[in-house]
């Protein structure tokens, strides 16, 4: 456990940059502190999933009210124009599978993915069917964790706009970020 949401977000981005499938979670006020890191993750093209559980009302929120009032905050997280994906779950079961999809999208497109939930979904208990762990296959995108091809350029201009990535310490993968 980190001392604040800012460091939680930075550690999650660092883990994604280092090759781990990475996610962190917070609620509305905590996400406000994480917004600078959302922009940083996009700038260095680090895959990360940030789960934001909305509470009702402004500031620290109302502890017993549910609403999806943080959607605008997700749209405007950090300054400048940069890519991000925003996904909202509508059930507990869907949240499990969307979490896997969010990790895949983050890695394939090398960007932050913001997964939105709300107080009701975040705090209630529910019996769900046994999860199918093979339903959403793991997709890592253009990722070279071990063997990096000759001529590797981390921020290469490609036809699809997505450059290959590697992890720190991979032979032939040295680059500036």
Predicted regions and their residues:
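Flexible, low-complexity linker and terminal segments
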Residues: 98-177
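Ligand-binding clefts of soluble mixed alpha/beta catalytic domains
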Residues: 57-60, 69-79, 137, 141, ...
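Short acidic, glycine-rich surface-loop motifs adjacent to enzyme active sites
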Residues: 82
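Thiamine diphosphate
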Residues: 1-76, 85-106
């Amino acid at each position: 456990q980190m001392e604040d949401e800012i460091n939680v977000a930075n550690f999650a981005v660092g883990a994604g940059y280092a090759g781990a499938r990475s996610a962190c979670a917070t609620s509305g006020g905590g996400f406000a502190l994480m917004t600078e890191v959302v922009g940083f993750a996009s700038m260095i093209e680090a895959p990360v999933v940030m789960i934001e559980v909305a509470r009702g009302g402004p500031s620290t929120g109302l502890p017993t009210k549910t609403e999806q009032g943080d959607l605008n905050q997700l749209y405007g997280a950090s300054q400048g124009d940069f890519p991000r994906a925003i996904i909202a779950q509508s059930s507990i079961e869907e949240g499990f599978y969307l979490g896997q999809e969010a990790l895949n999208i983050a890695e394939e497109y090398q960007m932050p993915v913001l997964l939105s939930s709300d107080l009701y979904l975040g705090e209630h208990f529910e019996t769900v069917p046994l999860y199918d762990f093979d339903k959403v296959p793991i997709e890592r995108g253009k990722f070279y964790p071990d063997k990096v091809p000759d001529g590797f350029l981390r921020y290469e201009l490609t036809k699809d706009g997505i450059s290959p990535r590697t992890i720190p310490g991979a032979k032939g993968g040295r680059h500036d970020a």
